[in-house]
């Protein structure tokens, strides 16, 4: 992600070790109106990254649950519930029908990726997602327009025919 922050989108590496959706973090496209929107890469990990992250991921939210402040014993367990609610909220709201947005759930944080019509619409979408139950934070990587070089997220590899 450092490449994205440094100035423009980076494309996922085509070569190197295989990457999989090992942790099953929910990642779905919730709106589809902007056909040329750069498609974000989903949450993919190499085997080495999985080994490195597994322990940390198993610990997130454990102390919160032990002291009775959280319903589930791990923060990542909420994501499978949160993302469908976020999807319904965005689709039923009506203000975002002219966007192309993907949402990713990781540790009760919702990351927004994709294209919107204006900065005001981006801000409104972020605020709307904050209203969804159990969301602990929103990471807004939405862009105005469809310029792939302006994307603030890794881009998916083009589909092979």
Predicted regions and their residues:
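N-terminal targeting leaders
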Residues: 1-161
